[in-house]
């Protein structure tokens, strides 16, 4: 095993163009934020190493383009992903409505037991908010996936979103697994300490 880390998890950020996927990645990986919006061309990725339960986990986070014309490129990145974060913009109802389509993409291209996380970004824009926290939470609960509202601008829940995803993947893989794709399904069901029931910024 590589001495630098115990696990290597590949994460994927998907969602409509302009919802803030790149901003979330920049905030988590580099702790920076930019107001200027430049559309991701194809795929970009960053790496950050975290500590979780005494283990060193290397996160390889892929940021995908939300535009339709890149869909064929990005579909290949679903394969091999351990976790997929579906992002929508809380000020854009259509981006939330399209979450169902993104989830269908996951079902079509990703491995069957991939971990999913729903994220409502831009929760700092309270006066422009159109997607209610409760609506999104109930939707996520009905699918059995965790949900958080985040703000890449204010760094609200960004760290927690990625840590939640890492913890969920680690829990699914079981104690003896490395990132070699061990498809263990005998997961112990236990409370996840990093999962928040509240949005924290609604």
Curated annotation (Swiss-Prot):
Alphabetical UniProt keywords: Cell membrane, GTP-binding, Lipoprotein, Membrane, Nucleotide-binding, Prenylation, Protein transport, Transport
Membrane topology: Lipid-anchor
Subcellular location: Cell membrane
Organism domain of life: Eukaryota
Cell membrane found in the keyword field: yes
Lipid-carrying residues in chain (S-geranylgeranyl cysteine): 201-202
Role, per record: Protein transport. Probably involved in vesicular traffic.
NCBIfam families listed in its UniProt record: small_GTP (TIGR00231)
Family: Belongs to the small GTPase superfamily. Rab family.
Protein name: Ras-related protein ORAB-1
Protein's organism: Diplobatis ommata (Ocellated electric ray)
């Amino acid at each position: 095993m590589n001495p630098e880390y115990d696990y290597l998890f590949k994460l994927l950020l998907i969602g409509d163009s302009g919802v803030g996927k790149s901003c979330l990645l920049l905030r988590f990986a580099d702790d920076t934020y930019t107001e200027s919006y430049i559309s991701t061309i194809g795929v970009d990725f960053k790496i950050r190493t975290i500590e979780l339960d005494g283990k060193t986990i290397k996160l390889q986070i892929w940021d995908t383009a939300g535009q339709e014309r890149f869909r064929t490129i990005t579909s290949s990145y679903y394969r091999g992903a351990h976790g997929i974060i579906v992002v929508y913009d809380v000020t854009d109802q259509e981006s939330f409505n399209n979450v169902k389509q993104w989830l269908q993409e996951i079902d079509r291209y990703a491995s069957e037991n991939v971990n999913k996380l729903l994220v409502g970004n831009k929760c700092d824009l309270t006066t422009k908010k159109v997607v209610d926290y409760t609506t999104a939470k109930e939707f996520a609960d009905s699918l059995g996936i965790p949900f958080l509202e985040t703000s890449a601008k204010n760094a609200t829940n960004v760290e927690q979103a990625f840590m939640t995803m890492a913890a969920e993947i680690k829990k699914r893989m079981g104690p003896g697994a490395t990132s070699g794709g061990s498809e263990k399904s005998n997961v112990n069901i236990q409370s996840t300490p990093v999962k928040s029931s509240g949005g924290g910024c609604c």
